[in-house]
A protein has these predicted regions:
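Long, intrinsically disordered, low-complexity Ser/Thr/Pro-rich regulatory/activation regions
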Residues: 594-600, 606
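Predominantly extracellular beta-rich ligand-binding scaffolds that present long acidic/polar faces
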Residues: 448, 458-465, 546-554, 564, ...
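N-terminal secretory signal peptides that target proteins for export/translocation
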Residues: 1-15
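Sec/Tat signal peptide C-region and signal peptidase I cleavage site
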Residues: 30-36
Length: 624
C-alpha cells in the first residue's frame, strides 16, 4: 500500500504551502549543504585545475591525510595603510620620518585579540591541533586531517596526478561560519601544488667576445648598429666589483674602497647626516628561500673568499618544518651572492626558509621576515601568474604582510618574471607572449619593488655604457592590484601612470637591472654553485642586485629612509613620461606587448639604478 502525506485530507492551498515548507526543511537538514546559509565566503576559491597541464583526477583525498592550514585574518583599518605611509613622508606630520614597530602595527592594523581568539577557538573545536597565532596577528596556523579541513571549511579535497606527481587541491571554495565573516579572509594550505617558481636562467659564454661586441642579439623590438650603440668591449660575465662599477657604486680603480669614514668603525650608530656613498655595511637584508641551505651558506663563504669580500654573518630561520630539498640551491646561491656582492658588505644576512614552494608555505616565510622586523629589505626571486594567488586567497593575505613591511620601513623586492608580458601557468620559459597577458605575483603587489631585466653593456673597464630591455623581462598591467599613490604622475599627484582605460591598475615593474641574457651570456653573474663557478641570470639576478643596491643607499642614510616605493617615484619628473634622470633610462627593446620608452614603461619601469646619483638625491624622509 502506498501512502500519501496528505491522503486523509483535502489538499488546500494552505496545506500545499505547509507541505512545501516541510519538504524544504527536510531537504535542508538532509542535504550535504544543509548548513549552506550559515557559511560565509572567503577569498579562497576552488583551485583552477583546468590550468594544470597533464592533470588526471584520482579521487577524493584520503580523510586521514595530515594537513597544515594557514588562516588569514582581516587587518583593522586596511584603508589607512597608504595614508599612514603618506604621513610618514610629509614634513610637519607627527609621523614624518618614522616607521612602526611590530607592536604598533598590531595595535592599529592587526586583527584584534578577540578576533584571533575566536578563530583559534573555532579551529580547536573543529578538531585541529597545534593552533597558533602569528605575532603580528595576521594569521593563525593549525594541523588537522583532510576530514577535519573539509568539515571546518565546507570544502572538498581531491587528488590529482600532475606530470607523474600526486597532489591534492580543493575543488570547492573555502568557507567559514558567518560568525567569522569579516574576520577570516582566506584559508591557505588546501593544495600542495607548488605554483611559485624561481626566475633563474642558466647561461653559457659565447664562442668569442667579438661575437657580442658587434651589438646585442635581436630583440622583440630590434635595433642594430648604427642605430644601437656598440660597447667598447663585450663583458659577458660579472663578479661583484664589476656590478659595483657598472651601476656607479664604485670607481674602476677601487671598486670597494669608497666608504665614508663613519662606516669603517665598529658601530653604525654614529650616523648624523647622509653620506655621499657607502657599502651596505650597516644594513641587514633577508632572502625568502626554501629547502636545505647548508651548501648555500658554504657557497657564500667561497664566493666571498674568491672575490675578497668581507664575510657576512648569516642566520637561517625556518618558517616551518625543515625540508631536505636542495633543488633550489642555485637560486639561493644567486640571491645571496649577488645581493651582498653589489652591496660589498651588509651587516647581516637572514634566510627566511619555507618548507616548500607552495603559496601557503612561502607566505609563512614572508610573514616571518616581516614580523621579525630584523631587516631593512628582503628579496623574493620567485613568482607565479597572479591569477593563481588571487584565486587561492594568498594574494590578499600576502598584501597585508607586505603592507606591514612598508609601514615598518622594510622594502621587499621581487623578480618581475622571465616571460615578458605574458604568463604561462606552467612557469617561465623566457619566451614573450607565451601565455595570456598577465603580471607575476608577488611582484605585482603595490608594497613590493618589482624588478625587470635588461641586457647590460659596459666598457672594457666595466663602466656603464647602455642597457637594452631584456625580451623576457616580466611587465605589464596587473589584473587585480590597484596602483598605489606613489606610482602616479608627480606633477598632479592624482593621475596614475597607467591610462585611465586601465582604471588605475598597478604597473609592473618599478625598476630593472641586468638579467644576463637568454641563452648566451651578456651580463651574467659568475657565482658559486655547489662549490663550482657557474653563470646564471634572469630576473632572479636583477632582483637581488636591486636589493643590494638599496642596502648601500640605506646604509648611507643610516637606515632611516623607510619603504623605497614612494621615494623612488618622487625622483620622477612628472607627467606625461615620469622620466627620472637619476635612473639609467632604458629606451630600447621590448617584452612582447610593451616597448621600452623614455621615462616609465612596462618593461623596465623607471630604469636601472645609478647608485651614486640616487643615493645623493633620494628624498630624505627623516628629520634633519
Amino acid at each position: 500500500m502506498q501512502f500519501s502525506l496528505f491522503q486523509a485530507k483535502k489538499v488546500t492551498p494552505k496545506l500545499r504551502l505547509s507541505a512545501l515548507v516541510g519538504w524544504l526543511l527536510l531537504a535542508a537538514f538532509t542535504s550535504p549543504n544543509a548548513l549552506a546559509q550559515t557559511w560565509a565566503s572567503t577569498a579562497t576559491k576552488a583551485y583552477p585545475v583546468q590550468y594544470l597541464k597533464n592533470a588526471t583526477a584520482i579521487g577524493s583525498l584520503a580523510p586521514s591525510t595530515a594537513m597544515h592550514v594557514v588562516v588569514g585574518l582581516q587587518e583593522q583599518n586596511a584603508n589607512q595603510v597608504q595614508p599612514t605611509l603618506r604621513a610618514m613622508l610629509t614634513p610637519g606630520n607627527s609621523l614624518y620620518g618614522t616607521s612602526l614597530t611590530v607592536a604598533q602595527f598590531v595595535t592599529k592594523f592587526g586583527a584584534t585579540t578577540a578576533q584571533v581568539n575566536a578563530v583559534k577557538s573555532y579551529l580547536s573545536d573543529a578538531g585541529f591541533t597545534d593552533v597558533t597565532a602569528a605575532d603580528n596577528q595576521l594569521l593563525v596556523e593549525a594541523d588537522g586531517t583532510a576530514a577535519v579541513v573539509q568539515s571546518a571549511f565546507n570544502t572538498t579535497l581531491e587528488e590529482y596526478s600532475v606530470n607523474g606527481a600526486t597532489v591534492y587541491l580543493n575543488t570547492a571554495p573555502a568557507q567559514v561560519p558567518t560568525s567569522l565573516s569579516g574576520v577570516v579572509i582566506a584559508v591557505l594550505g588546501l593544495n600542495n601544488v607548488a605554483g611559485l617558481h624561481s626566475d633563474l636562467t642558466k647561461l653559457s659564454l659565447s664562442a668569442s667576445a667579438t661575437k657580442l661586441s658587434q651589438g646585442p642579439r635581436p630583440l622583440t623590438d630590434p635595433c642594430t648598429p648604427p642605430d644601437c650603440p656598440v660597447p667598447a668591449a663585450a663583458n659577458e660575465s660579472y663578479g661583484p666589483q664589476d656590478y659595483q662599477i657598472a651601476y656607479d657604486a664604485a670607481s674602476p680603480a677601487a671598486a670597494s674602497a669608497v666608504t665614508p669614514a663613519w662606516a669603517t668603525g665598529t658601530s653604525c650608530s654614529s650616523f648624523t647626516a647622509p653620506q655621499l656613498l657607502s657599502t651596505g655595511k650597516c644594513t641587514a637584508v633577508g632572502i625568502i628561500a626554501e629547502g636545505d641551505l647548508t651548501q648555500v651558506v658554504k657557497d657564500l663563504v667561497t664566493y666571498e673568499k674568491t672575490y675578497a669580500l668581507p664575510e657576512v654573518p648569516v642566520t637561517v630561520v625556518n618558517a616551518g618544518i625543515a625540508s631536505p630539498d636542495t633543488s633550489g640551491e642555485d637560486e639561493w646561491d644567486l640571491d645571496s651572492q649577488t645581493s651582498t656582492g653589489i652591496a660589498n658588505q651588509v651587516s647581516h644576512l637572514y634566510f627566511y626558509v619555507a618548507t616548500s614552494m607552495t603559496d601557503s608555505d612561502l607566505g609563512l616565510a614572508i610573514n616571518k621576515a616581516v614580523s621579525s622586523n630584523q631587516v631593512k629589505a628582503f628579496n623574493m626571486s620567485f613568482g607565479e601568474c597572479e591569477f593563481f594567488p588571487y584565486l587561492d586567497g594568498s594574494m590578499v593575505l600576502d598584501d597585508e604582510m607586505f603592507g606591514e613591511a612598508a609601514l615598518q620601513g622594510i622594502t621587499p623586492f621581487a623578480s618581475a618574471d622571465d616571460n615578458g608580458s605574458a604568463c604561462p601557468s606552467e612557469g617561465p620559459n623566457g619566451v614573450p607572449l607565451d601565455g595570456p597577458p598577465d603580471t607575476s605575483y608577488p611582484a605585482s603587489s603595490p608594497y613590493v619593488i618589482a624588478v625587470g631585466g635588461t641586457n647590460l653593456f659596459t666598457n672594457a673597464n666595466f663602466t656603464y655604457d647602455y642597457e637594452i630591455a631584456w625580451e623576457a623581462s616580466g611587465g605589464g598591467i596587473s589584473l587585480f592590484e590597484n596602483s598605489p599613490f606613489w606610482q602616479a604622475y608627480t606633477g598632479s599627484g592624482t593621475e596614475p601612470i597607467v591610462l585611465s582605460t586601465e582604471n588605475g591598475s598597478r604597473g609592473v615593474p618599478d625598476v630593472a637591472m641586468c638579467a644576463g641574457g637568454t641563452e648566451l651570456s651578456i651580463c651574467a653573474a659568475n657565482i658559486i654553485v655547489d662549490g663550482s663557478a657557474e653563470l646564471v641570470g634572469g630576473t632572479s639576478l636583477s632582483s637581488p642586485l636591486s636589493m643590494g643596491s638599496w642596502a648601500r643607499i640605506e646604509s648611507s642614510h643610516g637606515n632611516k629612509l623607510g619603504f623605497a616605493g614612494p621615494l623612488i617615484y618622487q625622483l620622477a619628473n612628472g607627467a606625461p613620461t615620469l622620466s627620472s634622470p637619476d635612473f639609467n633610462d632604458v629606451i630600447l627593446g621590448g617584452n612582447g606587448l610593451f616597448t621600452a620608452l623614455p621615462g616609465y614603461d612596462y618593461v623596465t619601469g623607471l630604469g636601472s639604478w645609478d647608485i651614486k646619483v640616487v643615493n645623493k638625491v633620494i628624498p630624505t624622509t627623516y628629520p634633519q
